[in-house]
Amino acid sequence: MIRVHQLTRAFGRVRALDGVSWTAQPAQVTCLLGPNGAGKTTTVEIAEGLQHADSGTVEVLGADPWRAPAEHRARVGVMLQDGGLPQAVRPLPLLRHLSRFYASPADVGALAGELGIDEFAGTTIRRLSGGQRQRVALAAALVGHPEVLFLDEPTAGLDPHVRRTVWELIARTAGDGATVVVTTHSFEEAERLADHLVIMASGRTVAEGTAAEVAGSGTLETAYFALTDRSEPA
C-alpha cells in the first residue's frame, strides 16, 4: 500500500507540490492523470525515494522510501520517464543481470517475448527507438516481481498493438497482488487501466475515485478539463 499525505515540494520559487494527498491499494492500478506541471512525476519520485519532500509524509509498504533499506527497494519496481537504462548493453543481458539481484525473478525469456523485446535483442540500448526503450524499461521494472510498481507514462510512443499488450501486463501484475501506480496523460489509458483514479493539478489532488465516480454524469474528459482548468492559477 502507498499513502501520500500533504506533500509539499518547492524548487526555488516554484511550488511543485502544494499539499497533495492520495492512496494506492494492493491488487489495484492507481492512475495519476494531470497536465504537465501538475506534480505527478515529482510525487512519484518522492514515493520512489528519489526525492525528499519539504513537508508531509509518504509510506510505501509501511516505510519511508527516503530512508528505506536495500531490502525495501528490492520489493519496488520503477520505470522512469527517461528509461534510465545503460546505453552500451543489449536488452537480454541487461535483464538477465538485473534478475540476479532478486530471490524469485521473472522468467526473462518469457517477459522479453511477451513485450516483443526478442525482436531487437541484438541491438544495444542506445540504438533502440523510443518505443523499444520503453519496453525494455518496463521489463526491467517487472523482472523482480515487485510488490509495488511505479510506471511513469509506460505506453508513451508505443504502437496500438504493443500498448494493448502493456495494458494487459499491467492489469495482470495488479491482479497478482501488486500495488501499481501509473502516471499518464491519456484518458483512454486511465479508463482502461484504473481501478482508482487521481487527478492532479497545480500540485494538488483535485479528484479521486473510480473513473466513473470522477466522470459523474458526463465523460472523464469533460470532468478532467473542468477540474484542471479551475485549478490553474489566475
Predicted regions and their residues:
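Helix-to-loop junction immediately C-terminal to a conserved catalytic motif
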Residues: 48
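Conserved ABC transporter NBD signature motif
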Residues: 56-64, 72
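Conserved ABC ATPase "signature" region
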Residues: 96, 100, 105-121
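Catalytic Walker B motif of ABC-type/P-loop ATPase nucleotide-binding domains
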Residues: 149-153
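ABC ATPase "signature
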Residues: 208-209
